[in-house]
A protein has these predicted regions:
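Alpha-helical transmembrane segments of multi-pass membrane proteins predominantly involved
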Residues: 1-269
Length: 269
């Protein structure tokens, strides 16, 4: 399970694969295995240990892995210069936040994971589509290559900032709502309060490397950067996916009610 979702210490393959694979494959790998992995984990753990006499405190073990995963992912992301590797470590850190919800046993824990994964799909794919656009149009694969891009692609730069803000969990974005509901599980269940502190600290750490991209786009200059003709498919994909970060912030309650009802009807717990 840990290998599939890129949980520390089974994350070692993720940065190299993300950097070496075509970016379309990387975008797929950043989302699909996590959705499948958490679906299997929920079914396995909640079925195997529900009412079991086995003396295994698996929620505490998951909580420890959660703290390790988000911390290692964020710290290693700080020193990355390649955009795909940075997003790879960012992806690992987000697994840590989802594991946080998984460690709090209950129906709303499952709802929170589904809620987070749904929002993560849009915020992460929009960031990867922007990386794909930059690589194709400007051969820009490192953060320094993005210097001054806001002056050449102002619309896409704005939506990239929106995606990064959502990945960081800043309001008013869907990523903020997703993290609030993840942390809400801890405060309601009154379990692993230390893990909430770790999550908040890691959120602050992530701001640094997300802002490094924003800084390059808006506050650095590259006189040799030439404006390119945009790829219409990527252009509209970035706008559509990224705009959901605001749309779902405004209308998140209906989605939450639907997912909560769906989990209740599934009868896993």
């Amino acid at each position: 399970f840990g290998y599939k979702i890129s949980m520390v210490p089974f994350h070692y393959w993720t940065p190299d694969v993300y950097q070496g694979a075509p970016i379309t494959v990387t975008a797929f790998l950043s989302v699909a295995p996590k959705i499948a992995g958490f679906a299997i984990m929920i079914r396995f753990f909640y079925t195997l240990f529900a009412g079991s006499s086995l003396d295994v405190n698996w929620p505490e073990l998951i909580a420890i892995f959660s703290a390790l995963t988000m911390t290692v992912g964020n710290i290693l992301a700080l020193k990355q210069v390649n955009i795909k590797r940075l997003l790879a470590y960012s992806s690992i850190s987000h697994v840590g936040y989802m594991l946080l919800a998984f460690s709090i046993v209950g129906p709303q824990s499952i709802s929170s994971i589904m809620f987070y994964l749904f929002f993560y799909l849009f915020m992460n794919l929009s960031a990867f589509y922007m990386a794909m656009y930059m690589s194709k149009a400007y051969n820009a694969n490192n953060i320094d290559d993005w210097n001054g891009i806001a002056s050449k692609a102002p619309i896409l730069s704005f939506f990239m900032v929106l995606s990064l803000a959502s990945l960081a969990g800043l309001p008013p974005t869907s990523g903020f709502v997703a993290k609030v509901y993840i942390l809400r599980n801890i405060f309601i269940g009154e379990q692993f309060m230390w893990l909430a502190v770790v999550a908040i600290i890691n959120t602050v750490i992530s701001l640094y490397y997300y802002f490094s991209i924003v800084k390059a786009m808006y506050f650095m200059e590259n006189p040799d950067l030439e404006a390119k003709k945009s790829d219409k498919f990527l252009f509209w994909s970035i706008i559509i996916f990224s705009s959901q970060n605001i749309l779902f912030y405004l209308y998140w309650s209906r989605l939450w009610d639907y997912l909560d009802s769906l989990v209740s009807n599934m009868g896993i717990i």
